[in-house]
C-alpha cells in the first residue's frame, strides 16, 4: 500500500503502513488516528517533549522511560501506546511526525478522502477550516482531510498542497514576486 501513495514512503511510510494495517485489523483506525493527532498536539504544545522525541542525545533507556511516563500521564493505552514504544525501542521516535502524517494519508485513502497539506501564518478558526474543506471538496469531488501547519514565516495567506497540485497564496510569495519585478524593472 505504501508504494501506491507517494506521500507514504521511506522509514516513516513503512511504520505508518504497519500501524495502519494493525489498526485496520483491530478495527481501531479512527481511535489510533485520534490518539496520533492528540500526540501531535502534545508535541506542538511542549518544546520539552519535542526535544525528547527529536534529540539523539537521549539514550534509548531514558527516552523509553520518559515516553512511557508521558503516555501514562496522558492516558494513552492500547495500539497507539505500544506503537510509540516500538518506535522508541527501535530508535525511530524522531520520525513520529512523519509517521503521523503518513498514517493520516493512509486513513484518508482508506476512507476515500483526499488529504491536503495546508500551511497558514496563524491558526484557522473552525469556520475558516470548514470553508476551506468545502472549497477543496468542490474541486476534488471528495471529502478532504486537512493537515494544518502553522508557519509565521509565510506572513499571511495560505499554501495548499493537494496531491500533485500546490496553490501558494501566501503574502511572503506575493512580496517576493513584487521584489523580483521591481529588480527587473530597475
Curated annotation (Swiss-Prot):
One of its GO terms (molecular function) is proton-transporting ATP synthase activity, rotational mechanism. This is ATP synthase subunit delta. HAMAP family: ATP_synth_delta_bact (MF_01416). It is found in: Cell inner membrane. It comes from the Bacteria. F(1)F(0) ATP synthase produces ATP from ADP in the presence of a proton or sodium gradient. F-type ATPases consist of two structural domains, F(1) containing the extramembraneous catalytic core and F(0) containing the membrane proton channel, linked together by a central stalk and a peripheral stalk. During catalysis, ATP synthesis in the catalytic domain of F(1) is coupled via a rotary mechanism of the central stalk subunits to proton translocation. This protein is part of the stalk that links CF(0) to CF(1). It either transmits conformational changes from CF(0) to CF(1) or is implicated in proton conduction. It is a peripheral membrane protein. The keyword Membrane applies. GO terms for cellular component: plasma membrane; proton-transporting ATP synthase complex. The keyword Lipid metabolism does not apply. InterPro entries: ATP_synth_OSCP/delta_N_sf, ATPase_OSCP/d_CS, ATPase_OSCP/dsu. It comes from Rhodopseudomonas palustris (strain BisB18). Belongs to the ATPase delta chain family. Pfam families: OSCP (PF00213). F-type ATPases have 2 components, F(1) - the catalytic core - and F(0) - the membrane proton channel. F(1) has five subunits: alpha(3), beta(3), gamma(1), delta(1), epsilon(1). CF(0) has four main subunits: a(1), b(1), b'(1) and c(10-14). The alpha and beta chains form an alternating ring which encloses part of the gamma chain. F(1) is attached to F(0) by a central stalk formed by the gamma and epsilon chains, while a peripheral stalk is formed by the delta, b and b' chains. Keywords: ATP synthesis, Cell inner membrane, Cell membrane, CF(1), Hydrogen ion transport, Ion transport, Membrane, Transport.
